[in-house]
From Swiss-Prot:
Gene name as annotated: rplN
Keyword Lipoprotein: no
Function: Binds to 23S rRNA. Forms part of two intersubunit bridges in the 70S ribosome.
Species this chain originates from: Shouchella clausii (strain KSM-K16)
Name of the protein this chain belongs to: Large ribosomal subunit protein uL14
HAMAP family found in the cross-reference section: Ribosomal_uL14
Length: 122
């Protein structure tokens, strides 16, 4: 569960290392986001020479969450960290590589490019 002021690791090579959640998209009073949801973030830490810079406001999709998500068969999938991938408005990633595993729930939300770039889909 990601909410405002949550800090997430960035799991791509867009140049950002860490982002801070500003807003959860999808409804006027929505408070929390989970895997597959799009959030608005501010870049808090970035590598020099990257596509995004520190202080940029970007959209990101959550790919890993500590709280995890329940699947239809009753199982839960949880990760060791909260991580996101920076995306454009058309849901395509800004980076060209994805680091670490991503959840299968991204396929249901039409983030196929992220799923295809990921080294492992759990």
């Amino acid at each position: 569960m990601i909410q405002q002021e949550s800090r997430l690791k960035v799991a791509d090579n867009s140049g950002a290392r860490e982002v801070l959640c500003i807003k959860v998209l999808g409804g006027s009073g929505r408070k929390i986001a989970n895997i597959g949801d799009v959030i608005v973030c501010s870049v808090k830490e970035a590598t020099p020479g990257g596509v995004v810079k520190k202080g940029d406001v970007v959209k990101a999709v959550i790919v890993r969450s500590k709280s995890g998500v329940r699947r239809n068969d009753g199982s839960y999938i949880k990760f060791d960290e909260n991580a996101a991938v920076i995306v454009r408005d058309d849901k395509s990633p800004r980076g060209t590589r994805i680091f670490g595993p991503v959840a299968r729930e991204l396929r249901d939300n039409q983030f196929m490019k992220i799923v295809s770039l990921a080294p492992e889909v759990l």
